[in-house]
Amino acid sequence: MRQRTIVCPLIQNDGCYLLCKMADNRGVFPGQWALSGGGVEPGERIEEALRREIREELGEQLILSDITPWTFRDDIRVKTYADGRQEEIYMIYLIFDCVSANRDICINDEFQDYAWVRPEEFALYDLNVATRHTLRLKGLL
């Protein structure tokens, strides 16, 4: 089984948290709402990976005014590729508290939508199990 280290930002702006709706045909949780993030590349430092993933998935315009390592956890997940192929992966999640100075987002094709959500509105979203777990750990759900 392949192992991946995943950097995952929990991005907050003015009391709202950024959620991204995964594309329907790919990813670890197709069609569900999630936190952004992705894998650390070989030779890449953790914060470099976090900033790269944010740029790739959320665009160049989002400005983070604060990044603080928060927690980690691990899990085994099934990733679905665009061609329908699936792979079981052991994932180590490194989760960061992030504060954004703005809400300027330009999502890539990994996502079909995004929303800035107040904690009391989380129940209105089909959150994937990993995101629900993270939000519970943070005391937001």
UniProtKB/Swiss-Prot annotation:
Keywords: Hydrolase, Magnesium. Residues 1-141 form the Nudix hydrolase domain. Coiled coil: none annotated. It comes from the Bacteria. Its cofactor is Mg(2+). Its EC number is 3.6.1.9, 3.6.1.12, 3.6.1.-, 3.6.1.23. A motif (Nudix box) lies at residues 38-59. It catalyses: a ribonucleoside 5'-triphosphate + H2O = a ribonucleoside 5'-phosphate + diphosphate + H(+); a 2'-deoxyribonucleoside 5'-triphosphate + H2O = a 2'-deoxyribonucleoside 5'-phosphate + diphosphate + H(+); dUTP + H2O = dUMP + diphosphate + H(+); dTTP + H2O = dTMP + diphosphate + H(+). InterPro entries: Nucleoside_triphosphatase_NudI, Nudix_hydrolase, NUDIX_hydrolase-like_dom_sf, NUDIX_hydrolase_CS, NUDIX_hydrolase_dom. One of its GO terms (molecular function) is dCTP diphosphatase activity. SUPFAM superfamilies: Nudix. Monomer. Belongs to the Nudix hydrolase family. NudI subfamily. PANTHER family: GDP-MANNOSE MANNOSYL HYDROLASE, MUTT_NUDIX FAMILY PROTEIN. Catalyzes the hydrolysis of nucleoside triphosphates, with a preference for pyrimidine deoxynucleoside triphosphates (dUTP, dTTP and dCTP). This is Nucleoside triphosphatase NudI. It comes from Salmonella arizonae (strain ATCC BAA-731 / CDC346-86 / RSK2980).
